[in-house]
Amino acid sequence: RSLVSSEWTVRLGSVDVVSVGKSEQRFITSVIRVHPNYNSSSNENDIALIKLHDPAKLNNYVSTICLPDQDSGELYENGNLCHVAGWGSDRVYPVYPLSSLTLPIVSNRQCNTFDEFSVTDKMLCAGRQDGIDTCSGDGGSALMCNSSKGFVAVGINSVGEGCGKSKHGVYSDVRHYLDWIKVQLFS
């Protein structure tokens, strides 16, 4: 399923959502592909890919991120510390500039014990029980774990309950979508 892409603008290298910085690059999109089995009720298959109309210029503010591979299992271990960034709300108010958090991976079993969401094997959880979490506006942000080959996008921020309510955030597990991603890249 594709969305009308001409209505979307992508900003790369931006650290402030309300003003344009000298490091910012803006692009119109040529294609936005939503996973064909996305289910808005369960948030299963909550992943989409965006193709830019023109190529981005890689620099100190814009770079690529690695995808997980067969050797990435340790990144998904319970307690492994990963990072997420976004302009989501800070409990109530939007955050400017871009903010980031370090969050531990939480096992799906533990996540299903404490949270109301049904976390499937295509999802993963991260977060702390002290009220530090992603919030409204952070959806779609990458959950990034550091590895020997650089940062790896292990998850995509999908769903959570409120802001800072001692609940885990639920992410689409990128490992389960690698074949779909490859097909989209070459189609």
Where are these regions (language model features)?
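Extracellular "complement/coagulation-type" protease architecture
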Residues: 1-187
